[in-house]
From Swiss-Prot:
GO terms for cellular component: cytoplasm; plasma membrane. The keyword Coiled coil applies. HAMAP family: HflD_protein. The keyword Transmembrane helix does not apply. Belongs to the HflD family. It is found in: Cytoplasm; Cell inner membrane. It is a peripheral membrane protein. Its main location: cytoplasm. It comes from the Bacteria. Keywords: Cell inner membrane, Cell membrane, Coiled coil, Cytoplasm, Membrane. This is High frequency lysogenization protein HflD homolog.
Length: 209
């Protein structure tokens, strides 16, 4: 069956968007608020109608992720910030595979996310309460699967409990996107052998944004 590179690229951009948010938070203590909202909301919407629906139904919502994806796919410089983004992206993919193979982990994750939906009746998506709850899910369900993702940035910034919670919530969103990526036919070999196809698709989607 032919692979749907549109959906694969959208999901991959979702992973990259989370990686970029983590990087922004770790270095600056703040991030693109609109992109963060899209990524966090993707965790909570458990019944989207389409791959694009996971990210709010608009390609523009993934602009940051698409731009990051192009940077990761075409990085001639494997050092510094580009290397960080590549490492975060690949680490999220590895953790998703561990989540998929760990007995009961996906069910536990689903139950905990259902709890988030109930909290949304009382709190805003980007409230400290929701951020802390998402961070706790990452710590309790994802982190024990290993290997842990080493987040690098400003030590002073990373000492902030609020930044830590946003970083972990963003990583949880990255796991959500990685699950979606596999569901629509994504695989790590594509990063090596279908790089040109993914690059062309990402550029085509960005042209609409």
């Amino acid at each position: 069956m032919a692979k749907n590179y549109y959906d694969i690229t959208l999901a991959l951009a979702g992973i990259c968007q989370s990686a970029r948010l983590v990087q922004q938070l770790a270095h600056q203590g703040h991030c693109d608020a609109d992109a963060l909202h899209v990524s966090l909301n993707s965790v909570i919407d458990l019944n989207p109608g389409s791959t694009l629906g996971v990210f709010g139904g608009s390609e523009t919502n993934l602009r940051l992720g698409l731009e990051t994806l192009l940077g990761v796919l075409n990085a001639s410089n494997r050092q510094g910030l580009n290397a960080e983004l590549t490492r975060y992206t690949l680490s999220l993919m590895v953790l998703e595979r561990k989540l998929n193979s760990a007995k009961g982990a996906m069910d536990t994750l689903g139950d905990r996310i259902a709890g988030l939906q109930r909290q949304l009746d009382h709190f805003d998506l980007q409230s400290e309460t929701l951020m802390s709850a998402m961070a706790a899910i990452y710590v309790d369900v994802i982190s024990p699967l290993g290997p842990r993702i080493q987040v690098t940035g400003s030590p002073a910034v990373l000492q902030s409990s609020q930044v830590q919670a946003k970083v972990r919530a963003s990583l949880l969103a990255g796991i959500r996107a990685a699950v979606l990526w596999h569901q629509v036919g994504g695989g790590r070999l594509q990063l090596m052998f279908s790089r040109n196809r993914l690059t062309a698709q990402a550029k085509q989607i960005l042209a609409h944004c």
